[in-house]
From Swiss-Prot:
UniProt-listed InterPro entries: Glycosyl_transferase_4, PNAcMuramoyl-5peptid_Trfase, PNAcMuramoyl-5peptid_Trfase_CS
Keywords: Cell cycle, Cell division, Cell membrane, Cell shape, Cell wall biogenesis/degradation, Magnesium, Membrane, Metal-binding, Peptidoglycan synthesis, Transferase, Transmembrane, Transmembrane helix
Pathway participation: Cell wall biogenesis; peptidoglycan biosynthesis
Catalytic reaction annotation: UDP-N-acetyl-alpha-D-muramoyl-L-alanyl-gamma-D-glutamyl-meso-2,6-diaminopimeloyl-D-alanyl-D-alanine + di-trans,octa-cis-undecaprenyl phosphate = di-trans,octa-cis-undecaprenyl diphospho-N-acetyl-alpha-D-muramoyl-L-alanyl-D-glutamyl-meso-2,6-diaminopimeloyl-D-alanyl-D-alanine + UMP
Topology versus the membrane: Multi-pass membrane protein
Name used for this protein in its record: Phospho-N-acetylmuramoyl-pentapeptide-transferase
Entry-linked CDD domains: GT_MraY (cd06852)
Task of the protein: Catalyzes the initial step of the lipid cycle reactions in the biosynthesis of the cell wall peptidoglycan: transfers peptidoglycan precursor phospho-MurNAc-pentapeptide from UDP-MurNAc-pentapeptide onto the lipid carrier undecaprenyl phosphate, yielding undecaprenyl-pyrophosphoryl-MurNAc-pentapeptide, known as lipid I.
UniProt record similarity statement: Belongs to the glycosyltransferase 4 family. MraY subfamily.
Keyword Signal tagged: no
Record field: transmembrane: 5-25, 52-72, 77-97, 122-142, 149-169, 176-196, 201-221, 227-247, 253-273, 302-322
Gene Ontology BP annotations: cell division; cell wall organization; peptidoglycan biosynthetic process; regulation of cell shape
Amino acid sequence: MLEQGLLVTAGVAFLISVALSPLFIPFLRKLKFGQSIRDEGPKSHQKKSGTPTMGGIVIYVSMMVTSLIMAIKFNHLGAEVSLLLLVTFGYGLIGFLDDYIKVVKKRNLGLTSKQKLVGQLVIAIAFFLIGKGQAFHTYIMIPGTDVKFELGWAYFVLVLFMLIGGSNAVNLTDGLDGLLSGTAAIAFGAFSIIAVAQEQFGVAIFCMAVVGAVLGFLVFNANPAKVFMGDTGSLALGGAIAAVAILLKQELLLVIIGGVFVMETLSVIIQVISFKTTGKRVFKMSPLHHHYELCGWSEWRVVVTFWSVGFLLAVLGIYIGVWM
């Protein structure tokens, strides 16, 4: 019965997202909340300038409302769901402020790095202090085994790293039409299956609400995108997926299921280190998806390829997390 409820959860979130988007996009246009495009980015992206951004509000509302209602309906509104809603709200708010500054102040960089980091730290610390001992414990498990390592207060550092790093990694992936929407749906779908296997149905409900919300948004975000999610959506999704991995005790498995996000982040780190130490760039441009664009791949080809890689990694993650 609950498995059917999970499908209903995804369906409801999808319908809300699809229904809200056509109403919200003209509203964003009226407010002139259009995305500005970096001059140093691929030239093909200049035509996207002015496309409405902050569409992540649609994802945010769809998944928050649906997960809350369905968790209450199935009596699974526990500490886990509450923590997930807290992280999603907190990181979504940071993203909203970042987007607002970009579109209103016409500053493409939005919040300063320091301002963003402070906000992310506050949310991560609150997550740890509220959840420790109640929703999760301070050990990590080796995926596919019963081996666990108690980290004690070192786990606090891991939580901060995962939430801040996860939100920024997902944010880096949001550079092509539909890229993040598709990869996020795949990753959250994988974690929902693992959550069901662990009988953590509240977490599963939340994950399926995200799947439905981002797939509904993808209808309008696929190439050519009518709207971008902005940091409002990407930071919220990044913080949420890291929190899900922590609550399921699949911290290490996040590296596999979120492999696309990891590759995007590593490409930026490698690029920066290489340029600062040798004066040469490893990639034509980072994050990685832009490298393939400049290699002559069409935007759609890059997106579908990354979706495919994300799907294969998700299947591997499910196999390790459920059947090994």
